[in-house]
């Protein structure tokens, strides 16, 4: 069996980039198999190293899949839209910067668009919430599940977004960007914000070399990339009210969501979170344990960060490395 190993730069103090590395692990495990991964901090620029079956760069395989993927939402048996447990109807404003108003976006049928709902008897929580329905990412007969925000187990769901946005809508924007409603003379509206799909077409070489470092103005996101974070200050200016996009990475955002499918960082107290990286190749199952800080008797580095509040949203901040006792 042929195996291919590739590496990309990673900022170990960025929770989003470490979670996105987990996303590459999870996606490559489904798409290719034979996955082992680790972090290499022997040089000034740390790297994330990924090995998978086959003769193609595993990062390229994952990014290409995501550039073509379509979304389906999952609902439990008996799900009723607008039920008592369905959605956040408090009417409070979500403070995510640059989020387009409802009705201002195009619903073109393109990669990344929601293609309907699938009823499943195996639902991760007791009732469905329209703002937190699990999704499938589907392309060429293969699919990835993204459902951490709907986790009804005792495990921390690590859902950071809030307000009247849905997981599927945010995922759609991270993949296919945001377009305005087309005018009468247009077949499609102008592009407000780029997603992974546009970046793959326009900056493929850069994405393959440094996928976490290609940033673009974004509106609402899952709040994993701390470069896109902001908190409200009483200074007479808000990127939300001004509708300015803040530069961050849709690649980090969607891959971090995928990376949380089977793993969680350790939220050891309210809004205080720990995670770890490991320096020896591990299969996905052990990598998930290592992320949460399990002592695997391997070279490891541990980090801690705070979740700040931005309106009703939680947002990541850059981490500090914990000193070893």
Regions inferred by a protein language model and the residue ranges of each:
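Short, functionally important secondary-structure microenvironments
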Residues: 188-194, 198, 202, 206, ...
């Amino acid at each position: 069996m042929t195996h291919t190993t590739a590496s990309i730069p990673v900022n170990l103090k960025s929770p989003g980039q470490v979670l996105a590395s987990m996303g590459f692990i999870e996606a490559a495990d489904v798409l290719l198999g034979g996955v082992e991964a680790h972090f290499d901090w022997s040089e000034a620029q740390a790297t994330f190293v990924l090995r998978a079956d086959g003769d193609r760069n595993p990062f390229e395989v994952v990014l290409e899949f995501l550039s073509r993927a379509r979304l389906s939402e999952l609902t439990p048996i008996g799900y009723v839209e607008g039920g008592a447990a369905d959605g956040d109807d408090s009417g409070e404003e979500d403070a995510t910067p640059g989020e387009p108003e409802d009705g201002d976006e195009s619903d073109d049928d393109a990669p990344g668009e929601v293609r309907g709902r699938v009823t499943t008897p195996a639902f991760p929580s007791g009732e469905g919430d329209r703002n937190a329905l699990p999704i499938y990412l589907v392309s060429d007969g293969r699919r990835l599940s993204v459902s951490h925000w709907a986790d009804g187990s005792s495990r921390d769901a690590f859902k950071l977004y809030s307000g009247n946005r849905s997981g599927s809508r945010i995922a759609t924007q991270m993949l296919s960007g945001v377009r305005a409603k087309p005018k009468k003379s247009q077949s499609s509206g102008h592009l407000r914000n780029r997603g992974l799909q546009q970046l793959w077409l326009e900056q493929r070489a850069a994405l393959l070399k440094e996928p976490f470092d290609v940033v673009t103005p974004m509106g609402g996101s899952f709040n994993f990339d701390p470069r896109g974070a902001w908190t409200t200050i009483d200074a007479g200016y808000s990127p939300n009210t001004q509708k300015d996009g803040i530069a961050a990475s849709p690649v980090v955002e969607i891959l971090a969501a995928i990376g949380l499918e089977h793993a969680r960082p350790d939220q050891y107290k309210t809004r205080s979170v720990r995670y770890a990286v490991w320096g020896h190749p591990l299969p996905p199952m052990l990598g998930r344990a290592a992320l949460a800080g399990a002592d695997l008797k391997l070279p490891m580095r541990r980090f801690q960060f705070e979740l700040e509040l931005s309106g009703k949203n939680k947002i990541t901040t850059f981490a500090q490395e914990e000193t070893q006792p």
